[in-house]
C-alpha cells in the first residue's frame, strides 16, 4: 500500500486501536487486582465488623488453614469461626460496626450436635456422662452389680433445681436381660444403679445342639452392661420397671422399646459361682523374711491372719521375729506351718495384753518347702484380733522386725489394719472437668480443676472423703495434684500435654485412677502480621507526635511538601494476631499427636498474651493494644512474645520498615444500612461455628441513613481497613452526584459522613474522598489521597421486614430464609435449615433511625471460581429482588448505564466483566473491519484515475505530515500509557480526568470539546511528573496500568478548517494542528482539502 494510504489508514485507525487497547486493559484489570491482593497480602477483604462473645467462660476465635480468602473476599460481609470451649449458660455473639449492633444467642444444638441431655431444661455444654463399674467380679453368694454414674463438666457450685435425667442400666447374657435404674442428682450430679444377676447366669453357658461347647474363661462368664438416658416423670422420678429377681422370668432383647433412647456400652463384668482366694499383699522385711496379708476393711471382733514366709535361698538357721501392736488390736495366736522344717516358739519375755510378740524360729533340717517351684515357703501364721473401733475410724498399725544372731536387725516393716463399721467396695475420684486447657504457659495464671473423692458402700451409699486420702500424679510435667487431693492443676511450668494422664487416689486399701486430658499450646506460637514490610505513604502527612521525630526530607518532595512543618509522612499500619494449636500426646508411646480441634484449625490467643507482647526496637515500630502495628522509622526489628514465668521467648516475628514510599491506589467503599447475623455449624469440625455478618444495603424510607465502610489498597499490593488508622490523621468527605436521590450529612457524633435517602433512584451516586488531616493541609491545594465511589439503590415503600423485596420461602436446597429487619422494639432471631445442619440468623436496622444503602458488587473484584460461604445466601437474596421495581438508572455525566427491564432474570444476574469486555471487543473488531472496507472502497474509487507521476510524488508531503508535526515516537512513548494503576482508575487528581468512574460498570468518559479539540481539566496540572517517573517500568513494584476511554468529536471550526477526529493525549502545546499548503478558510471538508492539495502539486 502506498505511503499516502498508510497515513490515511493510521489517521482513521488510531482511535480504534487506542480504544481496543483500553478495552483489553479494562477487561484484564479486575483479575489483576485480586491476584495482587492474594499475592502480597495475608489479609482478605471483609466488612470490618467487630465480634464479641459474651456469657462464655472460655471461648476462642479460630482460623482454618487456607480458608480466609475463600470465605472473606467481599466488602459486604465477614465470616468468622469461633469455639465455645467452656460456658455455664447460653453464650451470646455480638456483632457491631459503627452505630449498628446486634446480638445472637448461640443455640445449644450448634455447640452440642449429639447431646444426651438435650431434653433437659438446663444448659448442658461440656457435660459428659461417665460410668464406673464398682465390682468387676461378681459371685453367686453376692450377685449384685453396682454402677456409679457421674456428670463431668457440671458446675458443682450451681445448686439450681435441675431436671436431671434418669439412667436405665441393662445387663445382657445370651437372650436374657436384667435392668436397673437411678436418677442423677445432688451437687455432684451422680447416682448408683444396682442390678441383681439371675442365679442361672452363674452356671456355665448352655450348649446349643450342633454347636461347639464354649470354653470356660478363667475369670468367669462375661456379662455386657449398657445404659440409656431417659427423662423422668412429672415429679422427676424414674418410671417404674420390671425388676428381675432370682427365679423371675427372663426377658429378651425384643422387650426393649425401640422408640427409647439408644443404648451406650458401659463394659463387662464376670460371674463366678465360688469366690477365689483373694490375692495377698507382701511386706518384705529383708531378703529372707516376708509378711503377707489380705487388704480389706475389718470390723470389731474380726481376726486377721498374717502368714510369714521364708525365702528358699535363706542361709540363716535361726532368726527372731518381733511384732508390736498398739491399743485396739492384740496378738491372739502363733501357729507353725511347717513344723518339720522349723521350730517355732513364742517367747514369754514380755507379758501383757498389748505386749509385743517375740517369736523365735529355729531350723530343724536342711530340707525345703513343699513346692520346689515357689521362691519362698510359709513358716508360720500369726493371728491378730481387732477390738472395739474408735470413732472416727482409724488405721491400726502392726510393726514387724527380724533379728539375727549377732544383733543383726532388719528395717522396720509396717502393716496397716483398716478398721471400720462400713463395708466399702470402692473409692472414686471425681473431677469437675474432664480436660484442662493449659493457658498458664501463656498467662502465668494457674488453671485448676476441683476434685472430690467419694466412697461407695455395699448398699450403694455414697459419702465424701476428705481425710486420709493420698494421691499422686503419674507425670508432673503434665499435671500436678494438691496435697489434700482437692484439685488438680497446671501452673505453667509443665513441658507437655497428654491424653488420659493418670492421677492415682488411695484411701485405706482401695485405690482408683483419675484420668484427665491436658492440652498445651504448641510452641513456638505463630505471629501473623498482615503486612511485614511497612512503608511511608506518599502524600499522607500527619501531625508529628511529641516523642516522634519527623521523617527525613526526601529528594522527591517539592517545596510545598517541605513547607508542611509539624507534619510527617504516615507509615503503613498492619494488623497482628497470635495463633496456636492446643495439642496433647497420645496415651501410648509412639502414638499420633492429638489436636483440640484438628490439625487444620488454629486458635486465636491474642487477647491472652497481649500483656507479654513487645517490639524489640520501639523506635522502629510501635504495637498498639497488641493488635495494630505502626511503623516509626527506617529499620528492622522483631515482635516478641515473652514467657510470663521465665526469660524464654515464646514467639518472634521479623518486621521491616522500609525507606521506599507507597501510594494509595484504591479506596473501596461499602455503604451499610444495617447488619444481619447468621450462625452455622462448620462442615470441617463439629465444634467450630461460623458467624456471618452481612451489610444490609437497600434504602427503603425517606431520610433513611447509611454508614460508610472503607478499605485502602496500596501500590505494594497490601490492603487494609481504614478503621485501623487513627481518625485524627485523615478525614472522609462524601459528595452526592445527584442530590435529588441522596444527600450527605456530616454529623459530628460520627467520624465519617452519613448518606441519607431523598428520592428513588440508583447508580454510582456517592463520591468519597480521603483527605489528610486539616492541620497538615497545604495552602495551595487540597490534599486528596484517594477517591472512591459507591453505588446506591433507593426504593421506597418496600416492606421493612423483607428488604430484598421477596416473601419468605425456600431459596435453594433446604435453605429457609426469614428476614427480620426492625430491631427497634424486639431482638428476634430465626432458624435457617440447610443440608449441613441448622442455620440461625438475625438482622438489625441499627441504633439509628433508618440506615441504608446498597452496593451491588464488592469494590475489590473476586477471583474467578472463588468459593465463598455467603454465595448461596447473597445469590438467593439477589435473585429474590425484582430489579424492575426500581426506578430507572440515574444518568451520570459521561456514563451510559442501564438495565434490561424486559428480562428481570438477566438483569438480576448481570454480566461479568469478562463477558462485557468480550462483547465490546467483538463490536470493536466488527467496527474496525467495516471502517477498513469502507476506506479501501472509497480510496479505490476516488484515486484510481488520479495517479501522480513518480517525480511529483517525491515532493508531495504525506497526509500524516500535516495531521501531526510532532515526533510520533515521542508522542506514543510519553502519552499513550494504556496501563495505569488502580489508584489512577478512581483518583481524579492523579490523572486529571474530570469525571467519576463506576467500579462496577464500564462507562465512557465525559470530556470537554473546544473547537474540536479535547483539553485536560485543570486537575491534570496537579499531577507531579516526578511521581510518575519515580519507578522504572521494569520495577517489581510498578503498578498495573489502565486505559481511559475517550470520545472524539468531529465539529468543524468556525474558520472552516477541518478538525477531523482529532485526539489530544497531552497538553495542547505538544501537537500543532496545521494545514500549511492551504489557507484556513479554503477547506470546507477534508475531501475537498485533499483535492486542492493535489491540484497545487
Curated annotation (Swiss-Prot):
Its main location: membrane. It is found in: Membrane. Keywords: Membrane, Signal, Transmembrane, Transmembrane helix. Pfam families: Ig_TMEM132_2nd, Ig_TMEM132_4th, Ig_TMEM132_5th, Ig_TMEM132_6th, TMEM132_3rd, TMEM132_C, TMEM132_N. Residues 1-30 form the signal peptide. Regulates neuronal morphology via inhibition of the WAVE regulatory complex (WCR), a complex that controls F-actin cytoskeletal dynamics. This is Transmembrane protein 132D. It comes from Rattus norvegicus (Rat). The gene is Tmem132d.
Amino acid at each position: 500500500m502506498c505511503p499516502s494510504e498508510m497515513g490515511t489508514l493510521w489517521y482513521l485507525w488510531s482511535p480504534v486501536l487506542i480504544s481496543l487497547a483500553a478495552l483489553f486493559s479494562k477487561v484484564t484489570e479486575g483479575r489483576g487486582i485480586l491476584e495482587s491482593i492474594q499475592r502480597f497480602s495475608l489479609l482478605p477483604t471483609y466488612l470490618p465488623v467487630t465480634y464479641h462473645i459474651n456469657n462464655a467462660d472460655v471461648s476462642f476465635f479460630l482460623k482454618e488453614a487456607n480458608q480466609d480468602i475463600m470465605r472473606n473476599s467481599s466488602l459486604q460481609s465477614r465470616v468468622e469461626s469461633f469455639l465455645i470451649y467452656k460456658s455455664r449458660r447460653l453464650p451470646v455473639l455480638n456483632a457491631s460496626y459503627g452505630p449498628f449492633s446486634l446480638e445472637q444467642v448461640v443455640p445449644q444444638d450448634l455447640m452440642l450436635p449429639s447431646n444426651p441431655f438435650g431434653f433437659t431444661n438446663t444448659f448442658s455444654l461440656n457435660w459428659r456422662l461417665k460410668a464406673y463399674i464398682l465390682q468387676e467380679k461378681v459371685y453367686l453368694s453376692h450377685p449384685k452389680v453396682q454402677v456409679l454414674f457421674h456428670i463431668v463438666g457440671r458446675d458443682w457450685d450451681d445448686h439450681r433445681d435441675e431436671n436431671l435425667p434418669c439412667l436405665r442400666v441393662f445387663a445382657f447374657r445370651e437372650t436374657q436381660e436384667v435392668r436397673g435404674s437411678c436418677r442423677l442428682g445432688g451437687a455432684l450430679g451422680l447416682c448408683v444403679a444396682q442390678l441383681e444377676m439371675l442365679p442361672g447366669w452363674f452356671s456355665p453357658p448352655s450348649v446349643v445342639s450342633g454347636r461347639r461347647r464354649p470354653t470356660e474363661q478363667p475369670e468367669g462368664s462375661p456379662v455386657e452392661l449398657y445404659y440409656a438416658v431417659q427423662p423422668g416423670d412429672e415429679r422427676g422420678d424414674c418410671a417404674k420397671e420390671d425388676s428381675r429377681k432370682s427365679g423371675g422370668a427372663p426377658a429378651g432383647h425384643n422387650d426393649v422399646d425401640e422408640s427409647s433412647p439408644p443404648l451406650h456400652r458401659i463394659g463387662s463384668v464376670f460371674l463366678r459361682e465360688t469366690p477365689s482366694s483373694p490375692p495377698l499383699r507382701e511386706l518384705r522385711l529383708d531378703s529372707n523374711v516376708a509378711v503377707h496379708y489380705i487388704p480389706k476393711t475389718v470390723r470389731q471382733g474380726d481376726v486377721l491372719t498374717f502368714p510369714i514366709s521364708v525365702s528358699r535361698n535363706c542361709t540363716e538357721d535361726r532368726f527372731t521375729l518381733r511384732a508390736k501392736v498398739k491399743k485396739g488390736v492384740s496378738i491372739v495366736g502363733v501357729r507353725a506351718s511347717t513344723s518339720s522344717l522349723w521350730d517355732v516358739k513364742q517367747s514369754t519375755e514380755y507379758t501383757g495384753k498389748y505386749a509385743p510378740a517375740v517369736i523365735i524360729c529355729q531350723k530343724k533340717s536342711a530340707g525345703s518347702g513343699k513346692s520346689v517351684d515357689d521362691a519362698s515357703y510359709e513358716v508360720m501364721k500369726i493371728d491378730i484380733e481387732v477390738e472395739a473401733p474408735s470413732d472416727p475410724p482409724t488405721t491400726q498399725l502392726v510393726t514387724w522386725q527380724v533379728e539375727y544372731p549377732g544383733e543383726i536387725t532388719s528395717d522396720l516393716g509396717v502393716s496397716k489394719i483398716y478398721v471400720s463399721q462400713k463395708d466399702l467396695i470402692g473409692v472414686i475420684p471425681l473431677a469437675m472437668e474432664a480436660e484442662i486447657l493449659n493457658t498458664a504457659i501463656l498467662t502465668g495464671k494457674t488453671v485448676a480443676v476441683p476434685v472430690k473423692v467419694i466412697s461407695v458402700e455395699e448398699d450403694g451409699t455414697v459419702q465424701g472423703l476428705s481425710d486420709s486420702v493420698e494421691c499422686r500424679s503419674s507425670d508432673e510435667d503434665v499435671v500436678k495434684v494438691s496435697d489434700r487431693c482437692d484439685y488438680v492443676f497446671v501452673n505453667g511450668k509443665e513441658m507437655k500435654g497428654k491424653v488420659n494422664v493418670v492421677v492415682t487416689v488411695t484411701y485405706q486399701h482401695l485405690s482408683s485412677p483419675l484420668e484427665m486430658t491436658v492440652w498445651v499450646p504448641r510452641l513456638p506460637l505463630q505471629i501473623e502480621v498482615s503486612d511485614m514490610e511497612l512503608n511511608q505513604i506518599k502524600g499522607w502527612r500527619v501531625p508529628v507526635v511529641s516523642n516522634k521525630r519527623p521523617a527525613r526530607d526526601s529528594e522527591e518532595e517539592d517545596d510545598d511538601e517541605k513547607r508542611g512543618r509539624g507534619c510527617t509522612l504516615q507509615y503503613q499500619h498492619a494488623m497482628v494476631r497470635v495463633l496456636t494449636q492446643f495439642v496433647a500426646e497420645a496415651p501410648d508411646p509412639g502414638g499420633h499427636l492429638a489436636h483440640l480441634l484438628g490439625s487444620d484449625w488454629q486458635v486465636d490467643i491474642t487477647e491472652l498474651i497481649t500483656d507479654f507482647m513487645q517490639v524489640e526496637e520501639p523506635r522502629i515500630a510501635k504495637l498498639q493494644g497488641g493488635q495494630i502495628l505502626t511503623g516509626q522509622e527506617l529499620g528492622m526489628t522483631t515482635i516478641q512474645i515473652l514467657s510470663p514465668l521465665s526469660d524464654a521467648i515464646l514467639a518472634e516475628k521479623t518486621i521491616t520498615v522500609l525507606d521506599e514510599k507507597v501510594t494509595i491506589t484504591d479506596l473501596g467503599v461499602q455503604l451499610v444500612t444495617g447488619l444481619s447475623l447468621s450462625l452455622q455449624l462448620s462442615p470441617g469440625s463439629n465444634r467450630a461455628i461460623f458467624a456471618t455478618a452481612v451489610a444490609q444495603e437497600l434504602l427503603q424510607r425517606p431520610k433513611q441513613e447509611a454508614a460508610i465502610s472503607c478499605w485502602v489498597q496500596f501500590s505494594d499490593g497490601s490492603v487494609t481497613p481504614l478503621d485501623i488508622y487513627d481518625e485524627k490523621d485523615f478525614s472522609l468527605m462524601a459528595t452526592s452526584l445527584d442530590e435529588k436521590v441522596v444527600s450527605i450529612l456530616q454529623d459530628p457524633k460520627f467520624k465519617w459522613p452519613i448518606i441519607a435517602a431523598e428520592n428513588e433512584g440508583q447508580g454510582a451516586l456517592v463520591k468519597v474522598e480521603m483527605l489528610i488531616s486539616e492541620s497538615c493541609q497545604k495552602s495551595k491545594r487540597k490534599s486528596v489521597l484517594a477517591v472512591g465511589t459507591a453505588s446506591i439503590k433507593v426504593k421506597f415503600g418496600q416492606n421493612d421486614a423483607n428488604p430484598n423485596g421477596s416473601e419468605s420461602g425456600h431459596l435453594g436446597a433446604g435453605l429457609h430464609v426469614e428476614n427480620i429487619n426492625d430491631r427497634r422494639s424486639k431482638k428476634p432471631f430465626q432458624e435457617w435449615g440447610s443440608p449441613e445442619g441448622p442455620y440461625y440468623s438475625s438482622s438489625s436496622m441499627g441504633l439509628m433511625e433508618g440506615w441504608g444503602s446498597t452496593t451491588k458488587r464488592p469494590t475489590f473484584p473476586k477471583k474467578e471460581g472463588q468459593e465463598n460461604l455467603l454465595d448461596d445466601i447473597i445469590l438467593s437474596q439477589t435473585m429474590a429482588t425484582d430489579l424492575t421495581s426500581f426506578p430507572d438508572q440515574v444518568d451520570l455525566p459521561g456514563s451510559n448505564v442501564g438495565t434490561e427491564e424486559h428480562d428481570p432474570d438477566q438483569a438480576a444476574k448481570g454480566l461479568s466483566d469478562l463477558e462485557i469486555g468480550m462483547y465490546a471487543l467483538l463490536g470493536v473488531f466488527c467496527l474496525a473491519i467495516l471502517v477498513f472496507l469502507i476506506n479501501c472502497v472509497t480510496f479505490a474509487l476516488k484515486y484510481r484515475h488520479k495517479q501522480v507521476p513518480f517525480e511529483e510524488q517525491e515532493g508531495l508531503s504525506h497526509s500524516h505530515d500535516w495531521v501531526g508535526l510532532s515526533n510520533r515516537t515521542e508522542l506514543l512513548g510519553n502519552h499513550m500509557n494504556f496501563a495505569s494503576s488502580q489508584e489512577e482508575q478512581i483518583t481524579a487528581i492523579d490523572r486529571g480526568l474530570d469525571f467519576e468512574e463506576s467500579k462496577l460498570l464500564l462507562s465512557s468518559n465525559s470530556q470537554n470539546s473546544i473547537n474540536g479539540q479535547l483539553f485536560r481539566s485543570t486537575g491534570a496540572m496537579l499531577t507531579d511528573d516526578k511521581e510518575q517517573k519515580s519507578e522504572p517500568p521494569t520495577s517489581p513494584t510498578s503498578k498495573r496500568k489502565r486505559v481511559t476511554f475517550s470520545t472524539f468529536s468531529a465539529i468543524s471550526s468556525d474558520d472552516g478548517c477541518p478538525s477531523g477526529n482529532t485526539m489530544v493525549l497531552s497538553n495542547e502545546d505538544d501537537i500543532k494542528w496545521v494545514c500549511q499548503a492551504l489557507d484556513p478558510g479554503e477547506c470546507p471538508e477534508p475531501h475537498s482539502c485533499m483535492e486542492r492539495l493535489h491540484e497545487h502539486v
